[in-house]
Design a protein with these regions (language model features):
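Bacterial N-terminal signal peptides that target proteins for export
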Residues: 2-10
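Short, charged/polar micro-motifs that form catalytic or ligand-binding hotspots
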Residues: 13
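C-terminal motif of bacterial Sec signal peptides marking the signal peptidase cleavage site
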Residues: 19-22
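Extracellular/lumenal and peripheral-membrane lipid-interaction modules
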Residues: 24-190
Length: 190
């Protein structure tokens, strides 16, 4: 009887071990925002339509004002990351406050998943193009990937140019502001 119980205990422990290896383990990291933004293709389409309208009206005045919402930026990043084979993060959430864009997400390394928070400040270079500077990054207990600034800057810039697309030909940004859930870009069409 003792051998039978010992076998059952070992079998149960072995089954639990295999089950745990089949899953991923969340190992913490920064807290996610209290409210989550559901990405939607409609938010991306609305943003593209908004851009077309802004650039159409700029044909007469030359001035362009673009307004991005947290939902639009979350959706753009979600679909850009989802299209990658090995994305930097998954489940992105963009929060726009106090001239800072906070990007939350989940990073996976092996069987471990950690919450991530990357804070970036958006500026303008001498050519009127957006610049993205990583101010801080918290990958929880996971190591911060090498070249995070370059990689993230390229992803965000590609998302920006991909979302705005050909309607922005000749657009020169003069001001960028981030506050209370919105990012506003003002500029001129060359």
């Amino acid at each position: 009887m003792f051998k039978k119980n010992k076998f059952q205990i070992l079998f149960t422990l072995f089954a639990l071990l295999l089950a745990s290896l089949a899953c991923t383990m969340n190992i913490g990291g920064p807290d996610y925002p209290e409210t989550t933004i559901q990405p939607s293709e409609q938010a991306v389409k609305n943003m593209q339509e908004q851009f077309k309208a802004a650039f159409a009206s700029a044909a007469t005045s030359g001035d362009v004002i673009l307004t991005f919402t947290e939902e639009q930026l979350t959706s753009v990043l979600h679909y850009r990351f989802a299209a990658q084979n090995n994305p930097l993060i998954t489940e992105p959430q963009v929060i726009l406050r106090n001239n800072t864009m906070d990007i939350y997400g989940k990073a996976k390394q092996g069987y471990f998943v950690a919450n991530v928070k990357i804070s970036v400040q958006v500026g303008i270079d001498e050519n009127g193009e957006p610049t993205i500077n990583v101010v801080s990054s918290d990958f929880g207990p996971l190591p911060v990937p090498e070249g995070i600034n370059t990689t993230l800057s390229a992803i965000i810039k590609e998302a920006y140019t991909g979302a705005v697309g050909p309607v922005a030909t000749g657009f020169r940004i003069e001001q960028i502001g981030i506050c209370d859930g919105f990012m506003v870009m003002a500029g001129k069409v060359k």
